[in-house]
């Protein structure tokens, strides 16, 4: 038999093995999904609270991916200014051999980071009084209240203040709906990341891979998968930094316990990527009772995502083999590759001249959070 015939047979055999593996993986995930409620009931209250938070974060990131909604984002930003900067970066790469591994998509991300921080979004320490337009010592906190019963703007909490100069109430609703944030263009790290991800998804298109990163010690950021660099890239829109996973521990001096990345197809514990100094690692057992239970339940949540992804494919395409092959290539292979390569340390490109300590938020606030760069 010719070598060409052997290659065809080997390729056909490989496809059969992949299809069989994908089918077994799918059936296992379906079975695990049925047992999820029972698995949750066996957890103690500490682990239940932690898992419930992960579920809430995961669910919130399933929203606002409809193309018609994403088009709203494109109508709200200065595309001409962004693409002018992208073209300049591409010219510098070609003429000065600068950033040779970055591709056009990476330049879009870099330029959006700059535009979003310097031209589009505003940081809020305290809300501004509607009458005197001041937001300094005249604004004093008076407590928090819950969201309204009808809540299209997805308010998580309302911070209440009083202007001592005007003697009027001032409120600061913490919006999660990115469409609302396109109007307000202001907030703290949660609002910044929600709005930034929404715009980034609109710019890069439906095939882009973007995920939300949640830290248990009250910070959030995001990542996208760079086809040029062939890995997940850290982005912090609040700070305007690109590919700086060492930022939090080594620059801010922040102590952390857990960091999770929430993508469309799976959740990944990325604590090792971002907690880069052993003296900044908070014992994970301070927030949970069983590391094993948390890992197993995250596996269950990932099974849910896998089943949902396959079900959505099956709604539009009836070819089972094709759907199983797509499931392998678009979900299983990527997840397994990241899971098995977590221990490989990747040399990251560093942004030049990053100042020490967190730049967003006032000095008292960053110091209270252990993010001011002082050990």
Swiss-Prot record:
Residues reported in the UniProt entry to bind Zn(2+): 129, 132, 163, 166
Q: Where is the composition biased (Basic and acidic residues)?
A: 364-375
Q: What catalytic activity does the UniProt entry give for this protein?
A: Hydrolysis of an N(4)-(acetyl-beta-D-glucosaminyl)asparagine residue in which the glucosamine residue may be further glycosylated, to yield a (substituted) N-acetyl-beta-D-glucosaminylamine and a peptide containing an aspartate residue
Primary enzyme class: hydrolase
Intracellular or extracellular location(s)? Cytoplasm
One GO cellular component from the entry? PNGase complex
What biological-process GO terms show up in the record? protein quality control for misfolded or incompletely synthesized proteins; ubiquitin-dependent glycoprotein ERAD pathway
Binding of substrate occurs at 239
Catalytic-site annotation from UniProt: 189, 219, 236
Q: How is the cofactor bound?
A: Binds 1 zinc ion per subunit.
SUPFAM superfamilies found in the cross-reference section? Cysteine proteinases
- What SMART domains does the record tag this protein with? TGc
Query: Might you give the EC number(s) for this enzyme?
Result: 3.5.1.52
> Per the entry, which co-factors are needed?
Zn(2+)
Q: Which GO terms describe its molecular function?
A: metal ion binding; peptide-N4-(N-acetyl-beta-glucosaminyl)asparagine amidase activity
* Function, in words: Specifically deglycosylates the denatured form of N-linked glycoproteins in the cytoplasm and assists their proteasome-mediated degradation. Cleaves the beta-aspartyl-glucosamine (GlcNAc) of the glycan and the amide side chain of Asn, converting Asn to Asp. Prefers proteins containing high-mannose over those bearing complex type oligosaccharides. Can recognize misfolded proteins in the endoplasmic reticulum that are exported to the cytosol to be destroyed and deglycosylate them, while it has no activity toward native proteins.
Q: Which family does it belong to?
A: Belongs to the transglutaminase-like superfamily. PNGase family.
Q: What is this protein called?
A: Peptide-N(4)-(N-acetyl-beta-glucosaminyl)asparagine amidase
Q: Which gene encodes it?
A: PNG1
């Amino acid at each position: 038999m010719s070598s060409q015939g052997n290659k065809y047979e080997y390729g056909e055999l490989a496809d059969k093995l992949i299809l069989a593996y994908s089918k077994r993986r799918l059936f296992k995930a379906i079975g695990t999904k049925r047992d999820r409620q029972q698995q949750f009931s066996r957890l103690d209250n500490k682990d239940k609270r932690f898992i419930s938070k992960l579920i809430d974060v995961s669910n919130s990131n399933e929203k606002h991916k409809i193309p018609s909604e994403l088009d709203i984002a494109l109508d709200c930003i200065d595309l001409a200014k962004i693409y002018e900067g992208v073209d300049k970066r591409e010219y510098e790469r070609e003429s000065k051999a600068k950033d040779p591994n970055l591709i056009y998509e990476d330049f879009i991300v870099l330029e959006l980071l700059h535009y979003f921080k310097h031209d589009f979004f505003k940081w809020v320490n305290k809300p501004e009084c509607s009458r005197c337009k001041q937001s300094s010592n005249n604004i004093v906190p008076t407590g928090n209240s819950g969201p309204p019963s009808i809540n299209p703007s997805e308010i998580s909490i309302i911070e209440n203040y009083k202007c001592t100069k005007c003697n009027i109430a001032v409120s600061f609703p913490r919006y999660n709906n990115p469409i609302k944030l396109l109007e307000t263009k202001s907030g703290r790290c949660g609002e910044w990341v929600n709005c930034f991800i929404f715009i980034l998804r609109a710019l890069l298109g439906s095939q882009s891979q973007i995920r939300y990163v949640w830290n248990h010690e009250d910070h959030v950021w995001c990542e996208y998968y760079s086809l040029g660099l062939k890995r997940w890239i850290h982005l912090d829109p609040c700070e305007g930094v690109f590919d700086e996973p060492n930022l939090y521990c080594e620059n801010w001096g922040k102590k952390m316990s857990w960091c999770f990345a929430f993508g469309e197809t799976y959740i990944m514990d990325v604590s090792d990527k971002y907690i880069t100094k052993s003296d900044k690692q908070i014992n994970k057992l301070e927030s949970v009772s069983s590391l094993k239970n948390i890992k197993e339940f995250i596996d269950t949540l990932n099974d849910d995502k896998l089943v949902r992804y396959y079900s959505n494919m099956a709604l539009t395409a009836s070819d089972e083999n094709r759907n199983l092959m797509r499931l392998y290539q678009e979900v299983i292979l990527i997840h397994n590759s990241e899971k098995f390569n977590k221990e490989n340390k990747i040399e990251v490109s560093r942004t030049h001249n990053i100042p020490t300590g967190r730049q967003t938020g006032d000095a008292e606030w960053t110091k209270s959070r252990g993010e001011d760069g002082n050990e």
